[in-house]
């Protein structure tokens, strides 16, 4: 039996999603809690392995089990065993061929910037702080260069192990809500540090340090060394994952902006 689940977490106190020997990780906590409910070892596979300090509004994962439990029992039992900074939001029995990572049509990330002279005393690790005033219109102009299918070599970490630097960005929105500047981006997949590198570049543009056209120039250079500063993980959230309707999983309203021809990432599509 294959089970899908949605997970929310505050990544501040974790070394990332993926299990690491001797370190606190989300995967380890989730597997421990589910194994307790199953009364047997459980191994989970997630849609996107977030780095240290990165949060999730809705991470999606799946696991296989022979233990028969109701969806409610999985949900309540696992949450009872989880620490306060991790919560399972929903549990669904799904198709045997569902795969949290490989079945995804798109992933959505949200980057939140606290744009004011002083840092936050209440939520210091839930925003990235920028004291310089940010011009959202300039950031939008720069963001427009990144929408579509491109070689994102200038925006991926040098240690990125992906076979291809090509990704398709479906949308990249920037808006202001009071003291916060919010960037929302959806793509068929992301290279390592892609969202944080884009955020760092757009913050430089918004602060007036660079012109919006610089974003297009960086894209054309295909050189990470020219790509500016990687923004901190604090403001980054995995917002949600979109799957084909056949799996019956609810979609975040943000995915209404996806193009009709959006499909899952295939590394062999790019050459």
Swiss-Prot record:
Signal peptide: none annotated. It is an enzyme of class 5 (isomerase). The active site is at 51 (nucleophile). It catalyses: uridine(38/39/40) in tRNA = pseudouridine(38/39/40) in tRNA. SUPFAM superfamilies: Pseudouridine synthase. It comes from the Bacteria. GO terms for molecular function: RNA binding; tRNA pseudouridine(38-40) synthase activity. Its EC number is 5.4.99.12. Coiled coil: none annotated. Substrate binds at residue 109. The keyword tRNA processing applies. InterPro entries: PsdUridine_synth_cat_dom_sf (IPR020103), PsdUridine_synth_TruA (IPR001406), PsdUridine_synth_TruA_a/b_dom (IPR020097), PsdUridine_synth_TruA_C (IPR020095), TruA/RsuA/RluB/E/F_N (IPR020094). Pfam families: PseudoU_synth_1. The keyword rRNA processing does not apply. Formation of pseudouridine at positions 38, 39 and 40 in the anticodon stem and loop of transfer RNAs. Homodimer. Belongs to the tRNA pseudouridine synthase TruA family. This is tRNA pseudouridine synthase A. It comes from Methylococcus capsulatus (strain ATCC 33009 / NCIMB 11132 / Bath).
